[in-house]
Amino acid sequence: MGTNSYSLKMYNPGSSQRIVFLGIITSVVIIFLIRLFYVQVINESYSVSATNNVLRYITDYPARGMIYDRKGKIVAFNQAVYDLMVIPKQVKEIDTLEFCKLLDISKESFIDKMNKATSFSRMKASTFEKQISAESFASFQEKLYKFQGFYVQPRTLRKYPNNTAAHVLGYIGEVNDELIAKNPYYRIGDYIGISGIEQSYELELRGQRGVRIVMVDVFNREKGSYKGGIYDTIAIAGQNLVATLDADLQSYGELLLQNKIGSVVAIEPQTGEILAMISSPSYDPNLLVGRVRSKNYGYLLKDENKPLFNRAMQAYYPPGSTFKLTNALAALQEGIIGINTSYPHSFVVGSKSIKCHPHPPIALEGAIQYSCNPYFCNTFRSFVDNRKYGSSENGYRLWREYQMSFGVGKKIGVDMPHELKGLIPTVEFYDKYYGKGRWKASTIYSLGIGQGELGINPMQMANIICIIANKGYYYTPHVIKQIGKYPNTTRNLGERHYTKVSAENFTIIQDGMQRVVEAGTARIARFDSLVICGKTGTAQNPHGKDHSLFVAFAPRDNPKIAIAVMVENAGFGATWAAPIASLMMEKYLKDSVKRHDLEERMLKGYLLPLQNKSLENPGLKVKDSTSVKPKNKKDSSVALLNKKKK
């Protein structure tokens, strides 16, 4: 068999022909694909260039979602403006004098803006002039063809038609480099909500931007979409929001607080919907819109009256006598006091005596009616120093837990930015300050009447009144009830938050609050035959005149509104806070106000320092926190006045 292995192979001429044939077919296909690419891409690009057309990528900014009040009234909408864009490489010789005249800018400004645009990119578009109004754009548009390399970018800006609710609605501003680095969605020139609803609901309001590719001729005129718009993306408008606010009530409350410093928060107890949230002094939200936004923001920021400061959620105040209600509720639940527990008109601590107006021993309902300091100082002492807890530290720790169940000393989850939790000191705080085992209720007794080291904001005060109105629970206070066509379900708003106090213990508290309005310290708050439950307060202020406080809800049997009013440096709660709250409740429940004399007195009231009368935006330099430390280690209540706190 010695045949060579190569002899087994046979020559087949057909195989070689097949390879040649396949090679020809492959070459034809490759040539066809190259030609197709040339015809569809390169040749079209040459065609665009040959006719002096260029491609321009234009961002389509979505319309920001509108905001309505609870009755369907628009409180925030959009108006058209135009940004003038520039691509430096495409700019040819232009008549800069005419250009500057049309835009009402100087030649120096023109040069500066061009240098900035070139520094950013010679090839990419950047903003040359922001937010040109529709009126100015109309005259400029006719001559835009003369200025090659420039084009107009349509967009919208906010408009707030009622000129109110600045702290609730918030404002928007341009994103900065830091924000862009954190969130890849945003690009240079985008706007974002910075405060209020605009910030909290940015994702729902902003929508989704789109991009159009258009052809532009040598005369700077758009000649239509590139390739029929197949590469365009459509902008998606933001979702509309329905707020819980009553715009009329909000405006009325702002009017009543004019020339005063303070806050009002009104909530619907049965839902947690915020009906009004007012911080005074305030500002017109339209000041922070448009080309003058930066200038106006600088003015507001430097204003010593701090109009940008949201006192409703960020200011700490001693709650004063309004805090007696939660003090009593904790003691009732623990069996420390009963509805018939009585106490005389004097409370003695060492050599000090805290007195009320002379009266025989009174029970809880009467103590609430007459705001008896000795009664509630004793209630606090009886709780904290009670032997069944083993020590004053344990008693105070439990008392503090009760207060926190009312939303004190913690964030209650409002759907607004910058909520502060307030202040209610811990056992560790007092141990550190006085020394462990060296303090007891008599050292910090002023907490029992809402003084001392307490700091609560008006939102928390209003929420406490919702709890009392509901007999033991609250819904998370919120400002948005509907997103698009659907209820707001983003924050479990329908969930009830219960306190540590049983429902039956609230009846006696409501009885006492009703007597406050009908025959006690807040008779001025009565109107019609409506049953109102309220409590006045006069909170000591270490920096000046006492603060005026009033909290209330109405009607008693079917609460529709709970309200907290704080007027700084205004004295007794019945003088200013109670009338303002009463007028707002009347406005909301009756839709009109009949007590015109009282209304006129509140409107004319000027409670600001005389030296500020000349200011455009009058107000008072706010104290960011009234959570003062004890004045000495012997007695944190040394400043407590021997007078009845109304």
Locate the predicted segments by residue:
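Periplasmic/cell-envelope proteins involved in peptidoglycan metabolism and beta-lactam response
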Residues: M1-S294, Y316, G395-S405, S446-G448, ...
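Beta-lactam-recognizing serine transpeptidase/beta-lactamase-like catalytic domain environment
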Residues: G2-L8, T118, D217-E222, Y226-I230, ...
